[in-house]
């Protein structure tokens, strides 16, 4: 192999390793068998959720996983592999890919990583069932507002009772 090719591959490994280190979550899939239309729709859905999706050679993925300290991921890089990276939303790649896989039987989830920890297919599917960040924040806000709302109702009830007595 020429020096230029080796240097280019080393640069790719470095770039992918940095993406792996920075990612909040990574989902590895086998997208073999998807139609062009399905692949385009999947990529569009992932892009709308700020998820980066790439098909990368396994040899580069294996070296990048080693460099990023994610050795457990190496077992997933067998056969055709595509990788979804999300730097912000932990749930987005799992949710988009899991939802898409329900309609596209050819899409197979292999596994992934969440915050640097290996994640099985079952864990990714469970993660996909969780609400997204905005949904979780609204649930938290509802829980935090409930006691204040109850106090307000109690004060209002006492005030109405005092008006009836007066």
Swiss-Prot record:
One of its GO terms (cellular component) is large ribosomal subunit. GO terms for molecular function: large ribosomal subunit rRNA binding; structural constituent of ribosome. The gene is rplJ. Keywords: Ribonucleoprotein, Ribosomal protein, RNA-binding, rRNA-binding. Part of the ribosomal stalk of the 50S ribosomal subunit. The N-terminus interacts with L11 and the large rRNA to form the base of the stalk. The C-terminus forms an elongated spine to which L12 dimers bind in a sequential fashion forming a multimeric L10(L12)X complex. GO terms for biological process: translation. Pfam families: Ribosomal_L10. This is Large ribosomal subunit protein uL10. Forms part of the ribosomal stalk, playing a central role in the interaction of the ribosome with GTP-bound translation factors. Signal peptide: none annotated. Belongs to the universal ribosomal protein uL10 family. It comes from the Bacteria. It comes from Streptococcus agalactiae serotype Ia (strain ATCC 27591 / A909 / CDC SS700). The lineage of its organism: Bacteria, Bacillati, Bacillota, Bacilli, Lactobacillales.
